[in-house]
Amino acid sequence: MEESRFDSEDVDYAEIVVVRHGETSWNAERKIQGHLDVELNDAGRQQAQRVAERLSKEQKISHVYSSDLKRAFETAQIIAAKCGKLEVLTDRDLRERHLGDMQGLVYQEASKIRPEAYKAFSSNRTDVDIPGGGESLDKLYDRCTTALQRIGDKHKGERIVVVTHGGVIRSLYERARPSARKVEKILNTSVNVFRLFDGDKWTIQVWGDVSHLEETGFLQSGFGGDRTSG
């Protein structure tokens, strides 16, 4: 493998490989997770092994960061073990959006069981908090983009991995491409490569790559990946 620092000593960016966690049973059942702490299922662990194998064959990873929720942390541990037995550094600011009273519900039933929460969740406004302690999209955006910038500032000239959640990755995309069309599905263990430059410039080099899953038979299911699945 290559060195963890890039060839040029004056590289002015950090390369951050942002990975969504593997599948959970709640993803498969379309249950809303948010901050609820659900473990990977067997399919999710196999997905994590595949993405770990892939990343271990690419440019060397210097650090692995993760949300502290189990589904992300376990995915990160599998990647870290394969990429040089690295320590996983957790950051609560990489957690999924808190979805308030929506959490724990099957998505199709949420509008009937928690209509006020569903209304807030479905709003076109980005400043609406979800009843039950949930976050607005603006709060999620500020939290997770600040976290990634903080991580990037520490690791200029390095390639690192960040394991997080679908809602977070969607916000990171909006930070890098504010005028682009909104993204819909973020697949489990998809690889998304960001470069964070000096001067707060972000670019996306790779988006939504799940080529490591193509031979596993997992790809067709989609693994949730919509904005409710976490």
Swiss-Prot record:
Pfam families: His_Phos_1
Taxonomic placement: Eukaryota, Viridiplantae, Streptophyta, Embryophyta, Tracheophyta
Classification via InterPro entries: His_Pase_superF_clade-1, His_PPase_superfam, PG/BPGM_mutase_AS, PGM_Phosphatase
Catalytic residues (positions): H21 (tele-phosphohistidine intermediate), E96 (proton donor/acceptor)
Gene3D superfamilies in the cross-refs: Phosphoglycerate mutase-like
Function in brief: May play a role in carbohydrates metabolism.
Annotated protein name in UniProt: Phosphoglycerate mutase-like protein 4
Protein family (similarity comment): Belongs to the phosphoglycerate mutase family.
Sites annotated Transition state stabilizer: H165
GO molecular function, one term: catalytic activity
